Amino acid sequence: MLPVASLLILVPLIFAVVTFFTKTKQLAAGFGFLGSLATLGLTLYAYLNFDSSTAAMQFYESVSWIPFLGVNYSVGIDGVSMPLILLNAIVIPFMILFTWKEEMESPNRFYGLILTMQAAVIGVFVALDFVVFYIFWELTLVPLFFIVNLWGGANRAHASYKFFIYTHVASLVMLLGIFGLFYTALNQTGVPTFDIRELIAQFQFFEPGLMKDGIFLAILFGFLAKLPAFPFHSWLPDAYSEAPTAGSILFILLKIGGYGLFRISLPMLPNTGSPQLMIMILGLLGSVSILYGALLALRQKDLKRMIAYSSLSHMGYVILGSAGLVTLSVSGAMFQQFSHGLIMSIMFMSAGAIQTAAGTRIINELGGLAKKMPMLTVAMMVGFMASLGLPGLTGFIAEFLVLTFTFTNLPVFVVIALLAIVVTAGYHLWAMQRAMFGVYNEKLGDVRDINSIQVFSMAVIALLVLYFGLNPSPVLDMMINNSEAIVSLAAGMGV
């Protein structure tokens, strides 16, 4: 069998290197698109050969790297990582197509950084060794920093440095937790290892106390800051709104915070000194993120900042469902990651298209754009309706599972989250009505609809939002067995 996990990292990296040396926009975009298509092909091969009936690791590879430290190049794919790899592989080719006709400086660097970002994110998803995991984790910072800093809006320098410093500091805290995990396990066993699954298994034998809980919280902090969750979200609105359209979508596809929560934090949680307290902390952060993000989204005048705060609100469901520690609540949290990536891609494409066509994304300066941009309006409607949780679309499936199956264990936090539903509907409908319907603002001049390539790109993603909303099983089935394994571990520890 092909070394799929390694190829999923290597292929976009190879195309990234080639793209960096191209001389024209068409060649840069072309090689970028070909690289993303090759990655999609490999992903579909992995998906079609993936066994959804088991929680076991598949496409496993392991090679000794630094033997005296117990570091191995170990990679694999399971039901936690496969949906997120699929999400990235699907969206990025259409994101590149969407930007095909955009004028930009240094397109070779732009598309090369996109492919580098894709390789780094997939590297995080397949890594089974903490050293490999952390290398790819940190690598994701570099392309995002430069994409915002070089091709972003007027405040791009502030936004890019704020994002880099904030998330890098959080990553260093996480690294301290990883080292604490490694050294404590080494003292107990005498055998060095950075294997993620082995260290999580060893964690249960650590002496209860401040050190043990400190290790857990340090690692968790790194994930929550990257997700992000309230109150670690201050980098998000500036970074999302100042990034170019492709950069905003790459931020949305950066699901490594939620992934780390499922892969590492939840399996460790039952073995902390105070698991019930940790669950309450997660439940509180999740529910507050949902409501707080929705309230801030309602206040925004800038369409892109509204979408950014909406993203914060939606990520709250990932945390809340995780805290529910029921198979279907955790599965709903995982599905929310997948759904959110599709939905927010449409929404940021919509905001980018409006800014390009109308010269502004201030909601009160728009109006009646549906008359001039009917194709965009249809795609945007799908994204906005899915984001507010309309039945039949992916957003409904995820939020329904999280709220329904978390209620038994954490009813108060679910009630807090339910308060946000009305607010969420309000800001989505208000923004659509003000921007796309009503009287056309003649000051906008002769606004043109999105081009045929952009229509195609948005239509494919919108159809996937509809398809997986009506038939979530092709993705959800992969998640359920792994969710059940996490929940069974918690039940075995009496949580």
Curated annotation (Swiss-Prot):
Q: Name one GO biological process term.
A: electron transport coupled proton transport
Kindly give the Pfam families that the UniProt entry links to this protein.
Proton_antipo_M (PF00361)
Entry coiled-coil feature ranges:
none
Membrane-protein topology: Multi-pass membrane protein
Q: How does activity depend on pH?
A: Optimum pH is 8.5.
> What family does this belong to?
Belongs to the complex I subunit 4 family.
Query: Which PANTHER family does the entry mention?
Result: NADH-UBIQUINONE OXIDOREDUCTASE CHAIN 4
Name it: F(420)H(2) dehydrogenase subunit M
Source organism per entry reads Methanosarcina mazei (strain ATCC BAA-159 / DSM 3647 / Goe1 / Go1 / JCM 11833 / OCM 88) (Methanosarcina frisia)
Q: Which gene encodes it?
A: fpoM
